[in-house]
Amino acid sequence: MSVLESKIHTGSEQFRENTEYHKGLLAELKERSAAARAGGSEKAVALHRSRGKLTARERIDALIDPGSAFLEFSTLAAFDMYGGEVPSAGIVTGIGMVEGIECVIVANDATVKGGTYFPMTVKKHLRAQEIAEQNRLPCIYLVDSGGAHLPSQAGVFPDRDHFGRIFFNQAQMSAKGIPQIAVVMGSCTAGGAYIPAMADETIIVKGNGTIFLAGPPLVKAATGEEVTAEELGGGDVHTRVSGVADHLAEDDAHALELARSIVRNLNRRRHTWLDIVEPVAPLYDPEEIYGVLPKDLRTPFDVREILARMLDGSEFHEFKSRYATTIVCGYGRIHGYPVGIVANNGVLFSESALKAAHFIQMTDQRRIPLLFLQNITGFIVGREYENRGIARDGAKMVMAVANAKVPKFTLVTGGSFGAGNYGMCGRAYSPRMLYMWPNSRISVMGGEQAADVLWTIRQEQMAREAAQAGRNPQEAMPGPAELEEQGRRFKEPVLAMYDREGSPYYSTARLWDDGILDPARSREALALSIAASLNGPLPPQEEGLSYGIFRM
């Protein structure tokens, strides 16, 4: 492979300014992430510990293999939602190595609203299960939850992708041979009782773990029977009498050791279908990415400068390097794993879309994972390009992305706007993981463009209203100065809305992505993501009616 040669001057004033700006964004990300990881209030955490419990993240640390990484999903889920009182949506999810086996871990945080399920909690739990199913990863549920957040019941209970879907997914995954393991470490009430009841194997902690469809207050109200939580659904009852649970643990630490023992006996081996080699560090320091990225998304830069700081040995076998240069395609490795890369380097023209479609088909047939680096304003617009068939050619790229069977991964490094989001494997195209950088923006179009479009429509509406009233539209319109002022006032709230909703924090709060990454650490997160995908089966090659690679 060719070695990418950086043309960035790391001693320049521009590089220094870029670095300072992006490190400021990173500091904000770290501050917000640390606050989310702290969980509930100090009082709630103290009460939790007084019961002999570990926190959700302490439980995960004790469960995974010593010294191994935990790839956490959506740390900032529900950020700035629900009055800021539900950090991480009250649940911690991610991929961790347990006894050498990658597992999806779902841990309720009982220090946050008693571990109850808000709408975003449900969405985050379901997303973790989706990742587990796509990648055939065992699920370990560390249960400590009061069930549905009752005031939010309309957004939690009745619909297809609400609380009940959790149990549906458990049943489906179990039927596919994807292990489901539950560790009941606290309350497990009402519908939540089905998490351990539907697991393949269940552990319950003595004294703290309880499983029941109706707690003592509801039992008393319904039947008049007075019973304690332990008598109704404690560990002794469920391991000795009902058989709902299989193992009784003395405390959290014992329960997590039992969980490790269960994983040890799953009889799972990964049979990789990729050509993996020993990893090599990039020739250029990944920390330099802060200086490579411009402060303004509208400022162009060569995406190869990012690749030089992300790929093993900064090696890159580029495809069609002289053709359709606003899209960069080629092969490289990340921590030894081969990847086919599709990276924006400007607006998408017809030629760019055709080149990408060709490369995506070829990479899919070679069964190499695809990595999309999104920094896209969209497809080119205008009469000339419409006449040349930009919609038809863009559709070819979208078709190739949608039908690629290999694992796909998306990293938004800048803008993610309009149909460009679709062509570059946005959330709707089922990438195994989708991450964003702190400088990224996502919306149907830029705020200024949206404001201009809406203001144009408003002016046309004003002219129609004048005509309908029998007035000359041109004479009825305000003078230039007044019209400009009206336009400014009209556009102001539109610009503010797009600025707020285009933020990566707005996106990650609503799980439009799987987390915001430190640009200099993205290489590690991508490697862990690719590694997890290898637990799944070999991507299929279609039987029957099939075609070779179309040269676009």
Task: Briefly describe each language-model feature range.
Residues 1-552:
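Ligand-binding clefts of soluble mixed alpha/beta catalytic domains
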